[in-house]
Amino acid sequence: PYPYPYGFALNTLGGDGDCVDCFVVTDKALQSGEIVDYVPVHLLEQVEDGEVDHKVLGVLTGSPNVVDDLALETIRGFIMSVFSDVPGKQMQLGTLHGASEALRYLQKCRV
């Protein structure tokens, strides 16, 4: 299971040709397909098989705009564990950026 709700930012197109992936760091149980308002807090660089597949990490609107170190390590560990079981898959995690870079990336990917 995913450690936090995982989905995508509406009306975006990332480097892999899909919508921009997002983790919403919350203790609240979200339903599959539920559309929520969130605040981007970080951008985690990820390259998968040579394609940019960065992840936006955010919190629900109205929550404190903080993703703590434990949540960050949990997400990094989850991503690494998912790809460690896929033969031939090349995946690399890069720099963790702050909110301003996450917002710039989302704006750049808007369609």
Report residues per predicted region.
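Hydrophobic N-terminal alpha-helices or hydrophobic patches in metabolic proteins across all domains
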Residues: 1-111
